[in-house]
Regions:
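Positively charged, polyanion-binding regions of nucleic-acid-associated proteins
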Residues: 3-37
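Core catalytic lobe of class I
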Residues: 38, 48-77, 83-88, 95, ...
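Short, amphipathic alpha-helical interaction segments positioned at domain boundaries
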Residues: 102-127
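Conserved SAM/SAH-binding loop
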Residues: 128-133, 416-422
Length: 424
């Protein structure tokens, strides 16, 4: 992705170790700063040189002061890498450099204020940039915001995340401009994590509760707490398997919010499930034949109950959806062929598809401020909804684009395609 302008230097062995080679040395020890003396030794070793070659000094310039051209070339390359955002000096230390945070993650993150077309189709657009900037002054009305913001993990994933102290403000700063533009029929579906713990403790974070209050203060009404039960691995390992203080986590909450409950557009008839064989047999038999009363008469069965044919069964607010799916496999394969990092949060297509069917109709606008693999955008595309996705990692924009390549009107920003190539 990064490009570096060549610098005019005296010919020598230094031409054998350019920006890519120097970067590779730092990447081999991504969490450790490297002093220049050690760097010179590693460069010599990788280039198959005797260290004396880097120590050789020759007269330079009118003054004739003697310098090592090879060491100078390496230092110039360090400066090029600094300007490209790959390396940075260790504060207060002379001649010691390290990878920047972005370089350690292997991602090209959008600078503040950047808003650039990533790719588009006839129905939607993916924008490279921070969503806190992308969705300000939006001139269209989102019918539903369907998203999974970064979780406030103690050990961030490659794409980074705010801390527990920062997460509520981070989410609200991004969502508030969208909430303001949302019509009264609009909704917000927010996939969060209950697997977040206080530092060094088995006690869980209450960031979900704090965010719930913040969203209510912003004028939204909580309509449901959907449980997404997946086949995620057992955890948390430390507190469930080692100290044995907690149970294994099996689900993530999805909070459903309405701008105005009376005009909420969610409709369970769009997500009806097939009746079970047992229930179909009950309908065919004309319904219940019993007369039963439960709970002091609060629940009663009468002859004929459940005998009326219906289009399907209303889903319960527990979604059982595995993490892997065909589109996820397609995304991973494309990213690997392009040499791109794979987004670590694997929300399946089926979760986004269910939420979009439930909360919107064809032609409605769906927005996802944290696109990741772009599954929300893809589900909106397949369901004939318009969509806008924001993503601050250029690599994730490029990888997600491959899911849309066969969609009508697909266009990938040529600069992005040239930077990362095309899947053959």
């Amino acid at each position: 992705m990064k490009s570096f302008r060549s610098r005019s230097t005296a010919p020598g062995q230094g031409e054998l170790f350019g920006a890519a080679e120097i970067t590779a040395i730092y990447e081999s020890r991504p969490d450790a700063p490297l002093d220049n003396a050690t760097l010179y030794k590693l460069v010599a070793k990788r280039a198959g040189l005797d260290e004396s070659a880097l120590n050789s000094r020759v007269p330079v310039g009118k003054s004739g002061q003697r310098h090592s051209l090879e060491r100078r070339a390496i230092r110039w390359t360090q400066q090029d890498l600094r300007r490209a955002g790959v390396l940075e000096r260790v504060p207060g230390a002379r001649g010691i450099w390290r990878l920047t945070e972005e370089a350690r993650r292997g991602l090209s993150m959008a600078k503040p204020g950047v808003k650039v077309l990533g790719f588009r189709t006839d129905l939607g657009v993916a924008i490279f940039g921070g969503s806190e900037h992308i969705f300000r002054n939006l001139d269209v009305q989102p019918i539903s915001i369907i998203c999974s913001p970064p979780y406030p993990l103690a050990k961030p994933r490659a794409y980074g995340n705010p801390s527990q102290n920062e997460i509520v403000k981070f989410i609200m700063d991004t969502l508030e401009p969208l909430i303001e533009r949302m019509p009264d029929s609009g909704s917000l579906a927010l996939n969060l994590s209950q697997d977040i713990f206080l530092p060094g403790s088995a006690a869980r974070s209450t960031y979900i509760e704090r965010l719930t209050i913040a969203l209510e203060d912003a004028g939204l009404a909580l309509m449901d707490r959907i449980v997404w039960k997946s086949n995620k691995p057992p955890g948390p390992i430390r507190y469930a398997s080692i100290t044995r203080q907690t149970l294994n986590v099996a689900y993530e909450p999805i909070l459903i919010w309405a701008k105005c409950p009376a005009r909420f557009k969610g409709d369970n008839r769009r997500v009806l499930e097939p009746h079970t064989d047992r229930h179909l047999a009950l309908i065919a038999a004309g319904g219940e034949t019993r007369t039963v009363s439960y709970g002091d008469g609060a629940y009663q069965l009468r002859p004929g109950a459940y005998g009326t044919p219906t289009e399907g069964r209303i889903p319960k607010n527990v979604l059982e959806r595995g993490l892997r799916c065909a589109y996820g496999n397609q995304y991973r394969a494309a990213a690997e062929r392009l040499g791109l990092p794979v987004h670590g949060a694997a929300q399946p297509y089926s979760v986004a598809e269910f939420l979009i069917r439930y909360l919107t109709e064809e032609g409605d606008l769906v927005v996802d401020p944290w696109a990741g693999r772009s599954m929300t955008g893809l589900a909106a595309e397949m369901l004939n909804r318009t969509w806008i996705c924001g993503e601050r990692s250029l690599e994730y924009i490029r990888g997600g684009a491959e899911l849309f390549r066969d969609q009508p009107g697909f266009y990938l920003n040529p600069q992005i395609e040239r930077a990362f190539g095309r899947v053959g």
